[in-house]
UniProtKB/Swiss-Prot annotation:
GO molecular function: large ribosomal subunit rRNA binding; structural constituent of ribosome
Protein name (record): Large ribosomal subunit protein uL11
GO BP term (any one): translation
Keyword entries, A-Z: Methylation, Ribonucleoprotein, Ribosomal protein, RNA-binding, rRNA-binding
Length: 142
């Protein structure tokens, strides 16, 4: 017999640092699954990754108090900030630039994110990444 899904929780957790404190604890606890069991499983799954990378995670909670989770690639904004070397995007995107990125770097990010994006080809994924860069105030150079 298939397990009955009780809730699906979407979180963005930094790799290797899932703790029972907010925001992870309350979101997982309300779903009725053991918080420490999830934290240990998530930290074990992200053990080989660099610390502090934001990981979009979807936790599927079942009626019998068990759970499964899937992790995606970090957001495009994380990759853009890492490539440009900035802490945050521009406060006035379109008016002031906070850095620049090359098309080769955009292609590299698009290839990493291709599986999570709804793009059909690499050019479409590159346009999505360029749009994210533009909305963050990062200029794209050739």
């Amino acid at each position: 017999m298939a397990k009955v899904v009780s809730r699906i929780v979407k979180l963005q957790i930094e790799s290797g640092s899932a703790k029972p404190s907010p925001p992870v604890g309350p979101a997982i606890g309300q779903a009725g699954i053991p918080i420490m069991a999830f934290c240990k499983a998530f930290n074990a799954a992200t053990e080989g990754m660099e610390k502090g990378i934001p990981i979009p995670t979807t936790v599927t909670c079942y009626k019998d108090k068990s759970f499964t989770f899937t992790m995606s690639q970090p957001p495009v904004s994380f990759f853009l900030k890492k490539e440009v070397g900035i802490k945050s995007g521009s406060k006035l995107p379109g008016k002031e630039s906070c850095g620049s990125i090359t098309r080769e770097n955009i292609r590299k990010i698009a290839q990493l994110k291709m599986q999570d994006m709804g793009a059909i080809d690499i050019e479409g994924a590159m346009r999505m990444v360029e749009g994210s860069a533009c909305s963050m105030g990062i200029s794209v150079v050739d």
